[in-house]
Amino acid sequence: MNKNELVAAVADKAGLSKADASSAVDAVFETIQGELKNGGDIRLVGFGNFSVSRREASKGRNPSTGAEVDIPARNVPKFTAGKGLKDAVN
């Protein structure tokens, strides 16, 4: 499912216009992104948790040349599925 399909499904289930559903989906994504950017976590009971993890610097290899390259440390988004979501897909 892509974003347009998600918007259409939200519009159908919530009885919204596609424009309103698109605004709602965008607002949810922007809110999650903003909270993670500010170092916060989002905990949605029964669905899952969004958080930020720190990936330390490491050494890697260029697969074409075999040359060693430095991979800098960075923050990466992380999602952990909750029990309700895990149960729903099994």
Swiss-Prot record:
Membrane-spanning intervals of the chain: none
Keywords: DNA condensation, DNA-binding
Record-linked InterPro entries: Hist_DNA-bd, Histone-like_DNA-bd_CS, IHF-like_DNA-bd_dom_sf
Keyword DNA-binding included in the entry's annotation: yes
Gene Ontology biological-process annotations: chromosome condensation
PROSITE patterns for this protein: HISTONE_LIKE (PS00045)
Pfam families cross-referenced by the UniProt entry: Bac_DNA_binding
GO CC terms, sorted: cytosol
One GO MF term: structural constituent of chromatin
UniProt record similarity statement: Belongs to the bacterial histone-like protein family.
Function: Histone-like DNA-binding protein which is capable of wrapping DNA to stabilize it, and thus to prevent its denaturation under extreme environmental conditions.
Name this polypeptide is given: DNA-binding protein HRm
Provenance organism: Rhizobium meliloti (strain 1021)
Organism ancestry: Bacteria, Pseudomonadati, Pseudomonadota, Alphaproteobacteria, Hyphomicrobiales
Gene that encodes it: hupB
